[in-house]
Amino acid sequence: MNNNIINLIAAIILSLSIIFGWQYFVVKPEQKKQQQQIAVQKAENLKKQQLKALVEPATGIVVQEESQVQRIKIESESLTGSISLKGLRFDDLILKKYKQDLSKNSSEVRLFSPANTENAYFAEVGLVSNLSSVKLPNNDTIWNSDSEILSPEKPVHLFWVNEDGVKFLVTITVDENYLFTIEQTIVNNSDKELPVQSYGLINRKYIAVEKAVNILHQGPIGCIDENLKEYSYDDIKDKKSEKFAASKVDWIGITDKYWLSSLIPDKSSNYSSNFNYALKQGIERYQVDFISPVQIIKPGKNFSIKSRIFAGAKKVDLLDKYEKQYDIKLFDRAIDFGWFYIITKPVFYAMNFFYGYVGNFGVSILIVTVIIKLLMFTLANKSYRSMKKMKNLQPEIDRIKNLYSDDKARLNQEIMALYKKEKVNPVAGCLPILVQIPVFFSIYKVLYVTIEMRQAPFYGWIKDLSAPDPTTIFNLFGLLPFAPPSFLMIGAWPILMAITMFLQQKMSPEPADPMQAQVMKFMPLIFLFMFSSFPVGLLIYWSWNNILSIIQQYYINKFN
């Protein structure tokens, strides 16, 4: 095994340790809180009281039987569910295109659930006022609707009139995907000025996040003042609340690995926003919310404001589309592409492009790997020549080391002089490695976080490229009727990866150091166990990359 492969192994192990260790153990540094003026602070305190009252039913203090709640049915190509006419709450939403798992009878993914259910999760937008005498729609308000069904072809119009004759109108539309648009209009038919603030909130009962997903962000997220704000559930639990005073809020929400619920406020003003945690009656809840400045509506005047709610799958092209169409900054960053974002997203685009032609993401991975190999061929050729020269110079280097073993400065001078004389660059062999590491992690991220790869099949027994190989040699790949423990789930693709790695070693010159050569012989076996639990799509990439490297090495050996 040559020094290039040794460097690759060491670099990958080191990079894995740094990336996983950093994301798992290091708590993100607290962001500095902005100084708030006295008026803003008063508004924040008022908002906290108002929004607390708005979500109080979600804590279980007020519970209404679901059968008694009037609802508007949601029906589109992507969604089914309903909106509660009591309080105008989005609390019943199912993603029709996605199943919980690959089993035949698997149910569809449910995103939103009513406040009094086990997995309560809902969104709402509305109005509050800093005057208690102003009667506004609230959680107990029963709205009147002109339709019982909301669909992309048929918006819903709702209205409610208070005791002073002030009319509140709401128009809700939904597109073919996951975006709701809510336009609120207030018609002030009273003889008094009407101070109002628009708000939006998403409230969720906490569901434990598995440690295995600490390599990606889950929890409150948003784009505030054109900066991405990410806080884990633990971050917000420790802080209780993270506040952002009057800011430009492009969007805020709560994200899962594949699903996102987010509020997209009107761009007409700045908003105060919060990421909150609360524990009531033993129930942990998280909430993200925003509220606008006070808007004074004079008698006889109207006021309208538009907000949007995204609730659905984090499809890359869909988030890109909304980001461009509605100027929603950093909306695609709801997908955690990680540190190598500038590489990971183009890698996804390439895979998705070829998927459009071949209809299989596994085949798309193979094609992208070939392209990467072709782009790196010249670099790999130069690297191999450099390593061959280094191999030939090893006896002379050993002689110099013995000669100047007591004089390190002279030793380094003589070795560098030898490199210069023979026109050898000692780091040339590392260049392909530096390219392969970000590509490796980018493909891993694409497989792990994109909804497009979720339950995407390859061929044969591979039904989900984002999951580990489901077979294992320890039950003869399913022939024996028992399931080994997870650490013994050594499937066919991990074995193929180890075999191709071993063959690649055989194609390469052994290290000059006998001890190092012995250690390297065990690396395929170590990697076999180390990567057996990784997404099988990554093992397909690595196995195919090894095969291409063997072919490339054969070509270079023959013609050089």
Curated annotation (Swiss-Prot):
Family: Belongs to the OXA1/ALB3/YidC family. Type 1 subfamily.
Gene name of this polypeptide: yidC
InterPro entries: Membr_insert_YidC, Membr_insert_YidC_N, YidC/ALB3/OXA1/COX18, YidC/Oxa/ALB_C, YidC_ALB_C, YidC_periplasmic_sf
Role according to the record: Required for the insertion and/or proper folding and/or complex formation of integral membrane proteins into the membrane. Involved in integration of membrane proteins that insert both dependently and independently of the Sec translocase complex, as well as at least some lipoproteins. Aids folding of multispanning membrane proteins.
Top-level lineage group: Bacteria
CDD domains given in the database record: 5TM_YidC_Alb3, EcYidC-like_peri
Main location: membrane
One Gene Ontology molecular-function label: membrane insertase activity
Listed name of the protein: Membrane protein insertase YidC
Assembly mode: Interacts with the Sec translocase complex via SecD. Specifically interacts with transmembrane segments of nascent integral membrane proteins during membrane integration.
Pfam family, one: YidC_periplas
Transmembrane portions of the chain: 5-25, 334-354, 357-377, 431-451, 476-496, 522-542
